């Protein structure tokens, strides 16, 4: 599977000084080690890895061979983007009748780095949060997400991971999610929010800047609407929709995101659900979405 293909991949280098980048396999292993050491005594599963955007090449000796004569050993590959998740199933809680497991997610995208330069710190994204076992939706809260982790070697990466795990407050995060289940909205309010989310994307930039960010695409907003009608776990057509279910409609729609925008949108789903929940209780910041 993906585990094998990232081990057999070549490692891109910085072209000005030929210095190695930290490859995907080293990224996964480093975070796996950090998780096992931080959560010692818990069951820490092996990473589940996804890769995309394959980049193929040939070794120099095979440059002049016709394609049909290439041996496997003549070919090189690497993947521009990789993501993985590591579950810790012994740390779990039930929210809104759904079992949530602690989960760590990492994302790496070479397309967001300048490989044409000399070696500079490399960009990684790392999150710790809870994964909904019913649907595998990922729940991420601000203090569990580093969207701009820049490190030069695996030692720094390991240290940054431990720091993130240490700063994360699972009890606070769970409390926040449990609160969502206590508020509901009518179909009319839901339709209003969906409409406003669609309008949001067409607003002039200045107007948009004055509002909280909303990162879901048009297609994703449509799938939130579809899931509201059809989803067996979180659909609420014909009845009140509680905010925990609304939140899961958002995180569910985010599953169609490319690897490199997935975590930002996961966090944004939390911001939207918590913000709209507060607006329903009279808070001003997300008021525009419900008016």
Model-found features: residue ranges?
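Amphipathic alpha-helical segments
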Residues: 17-45
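A short acidic/basic microdomain associated with nuclease active sites
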Residues: 38-76, 80-83
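Acidic, low-complexity, intrinsically disordered interaction modules
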Residues: 7-17
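Intrinsically disordered, low-complexity regions enriched in serine/threonine
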Residues: 67-291
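Short, small-residue-biased leader/transition segments that mark boundaries at the very start
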Residues: 1-6
